[in-house]
Every structure is written in structure tokens, then in C-alpha cells.
Amino acid sequence: MSFLKEFDKDIFDLCEKELERQSNHLEMIASENFTLPAVMEAMGSVFTNKYAEGYPAKRYYGGCEYADGVEQLAIDRACKLFGCNYANVQPHSGSQANAAVYAALLKAGDKLLGMDLSHGGHLTHGSKPSFSGQNYSSFTYGVELDGRMNYDKILEIAKAVQPKIIVCGASAYAREIDFKKFREIADAVGAIMFADIAHVAGLVVAGEHMSPFPHAHVVTTTTHKTLAGPRGGMIMTNDEDIAKKINSAIFPGIQGGPLVHVIAAKAVGFKYNLSAEWKDYAVQVKANAKILGEVLVKRGYDLVSGGTDNHLVLLSFLNRDFSGKDADIALGNAGITVNKNTVPGETRSPFVTSGIRIGSPALTSRGMKEREFEFIANKIADVLDDINNTKLQESVKKELKELAQKFVIYNQSTY
């Protein structure tokens, strides 16, 4: 029986509607994925009730022996997964993981060098509206006209800026990041190298993207996105001194009690990431993104950097008379969920943008392969070719609903 349905039908009904949306629409936001029912079940476990301030064997509350077991299992699996010595699995999100890194390793006003938001970076990499741009003196590097990072240029900027920390990682960059080169840049200016791999972590652990280890001094990730686990964050390092500073920065620095039920779910997710089938999934994610990009290029659309090495493509509409927002809405009406995104050389506001970001992880989790992605890519192009044709959008929506119903994700909205 559903306790939720009996107790709060309003929320239950919204859960059911969300299940219907996730089932019948094609989820192509690059940062979203479908997690396992076992992960959701762990999040709904009795660990929801437990306070566990501190760390395993060093708690401020009694009754934490099983919470300790959960957290230690998550830590051990994370270290095995990424090939590192230390992991903090307590951050509630990727942004809080990044905040803890800065709190641990920087003082207010220290110089931070990160990727420009409009070039594919993240708010927490020094963007002015973010705490990272307000508490620290932030500087940026970007991509060249070809949409790719120029590591020689980044070195020039680093030499001019002399940052305390260099952030490498992105939220909308379709090419593989060379962490070895970033470490060389950091060493050349005496900076800490901080890799935020939130978007590519699932590919990294499968050997489908260069690993930040052993190059980075400190690494953060989210546990959802390409890892397909619960929503949350994590920090890793091989340096014992940095690990101690990170632990103190998380608790008591910026968080109180950890979410033990979510840490349990993270451990379950890591078990999935450590399985033999995970490699197959990661390979398919990249193959699906590749065919998506190739079809869109054939149909005359511009991709930032011309293609993809990972799980996403970034379309640029700088040479079109419609915006990223227009494309986002039109595709949404056709049953495809994407997000508007700024692009290099952006001329429109961040609320309108000149691009969209499209990812393959969620539909790959549903079992879709190249054949389905080729079909979907052509439908995306059809909609964009005639962006104001609402009848076409309705017709595509029906076709895609039929496709979606062949790839069932969940048979219930709560676990």
C-alpha cells in the first residue's frame, strides 16, 4: 500500500503526475538522470530519522553505530571507484562541496581562476552572482572561437593572475578536459588544482574520460548526473592534510548533521557504478551523444566545438533569428526536455540565451541506443526548422510519446 497516498493525496497526486511526465517526455537535460529504485528506497529508509553530526567513530550523538557503517561503506566504495585515498560523502550538493573546498583552502579575497560561465563554466567557479565570485577575487578563462579550451592561453592567464586556486571542470563543455595539462598550469604558478567533475564523473569511473587523479589536489562531484545516484555532493583527495581541512570545512564549517539516508543512497549508487554493467552504460552514453551531434550537424545546426567527446552537445543559435529560450519552449511543447544555455560569444541575456544544452544520460538509462537517438535528433531538427509550427510540435509529441512508452523507467512514483 502507499502510505503517502493515504496520508497526503495532494503530494501523492503530484508524484504521480511527475512520474507521467518523466515517463512520457524525453528527458534530455544533460545534468539529469534516472536513478535506481534501490537508491530511492534507501533515501526513504529509517536513516531519515538519525542525527549523526561528526564523522564515523567521532560523532557528537549516541546511537550512531549503524550510521557509521553506512557512511564508512559509502567512503570505501567512493575511494575504490575513483582510485583516491580520502572521500567526504557528506556534502548535500555539488555547490556545497565546492563551497567547502574554498572554505578549507582559501581566505576571503584570495584569487580564484575558473571557467567563464558563458563559455561552459559553473556558477560556483567564480561567477559574480555566486558566493564564489563574491567572497573571493575571481578571474576567468574561456574557450577559443573553435569552442575548445586553449591550454597555452589558460597558462598565460594564470601567469598574469597568479591565482591561489585553479578550478577545472564545466557544466556545458562537450570536449574532454585534460587534467594533466591543468596540473602543469597550476604547478607553473604555484596554485592548487581543483577539479570539479560533476558532469563527467560517471564517464571517469568507467574509464571513458580522463581521471582527475593523480593530477588534482582536490576533486568534487555530484552523485547524480552521469553517476545516476541520489542528489548530493562529494569531495575527494589523496592529500591527508587537505582531507583534514575539508572535513573541518564541511563539519562544523558549513553543515551540521549529515543526511544519513542520502549517504546510504550514495553507497547504493556507488555499488552500481562499481558493477561490470556500468562500463557498458558509459560507453553507450558517449555513443548516443555522438550520433545526436552528428545528425544535428548534418541537419545544418552549429555545435559549439563542432561535436562532443562526452555526454552532451551544445547547440549555438548565434546565427539564427530564434533564441535558446525559444528552442527550449518549442522542444518542450514537442515532448523533449532540454535547457536554454549561454554559448561562447553570447549576445543575449542569461534568461534568453543563444543556445541549448542536450544530454544523453537519462535516455540511455532508459535503454535507448543509437537508433533511437538518430530518430530523436531528426525530430529535434524538424521542430527547430519550423520553430513556430505548434501543429508540428503536437504531432512530434505524439510520436515521441509512443517511443517513450517502449522504454519504461518506473512502474510506480514512490519507493
Swiss-Prot record:
Function: Catalyzes the reversible interconversion of serine and glycine with tetrahydrofolate (THF) serving as the one-carbon carrier. This reaction serves as the major source of one-carbon groups required for the biosynthesis of purines, thymidylate, methionine, and other important biomolecules. Also exhibits THF-independent aldolase activity toward beta-hydroxyamino acids, producing glycine and aldehydes, via a retro-aldol mechanism.
Gene Ontology molecular-function annotations: glycine hydroxymethyltransferase activity; pyridoxal phosphate binding
Pathway(s) it belongs to: One-carbon metabolism; tetrahydrofolate interconversion; Amino-acid biosynthesis; glycine biosynthesis; glycine from L-serine: step 1/1
Gene3D superfamilies linked: Aspartate Aminotransferase, domain 1 (3.90.1150.10), Type I PLP-dependent aspartate aminotransferase-like (Major domain) (3.40.640.10)
EC identifiers of the protein: 2.1.2.1
Sequence positions bearing N6-(pyridoxal phosphate)lysine: K225
Annotated binding of (6S)-5,6,7,8-tetrahydrofolate, by residue: L117, G121, H122, L123, S349, P350, F351
Name recorded for this polypeptide: Serine hydroxymethyltransferase 1
Entry keywords, A to Z: Amino-acid biosynthesis, Cytoplasm, One-carbon metabolism, Pyridoxal phosphate, Transferase
Superkingdom: Bacteria
Catalytic EC class: transferase
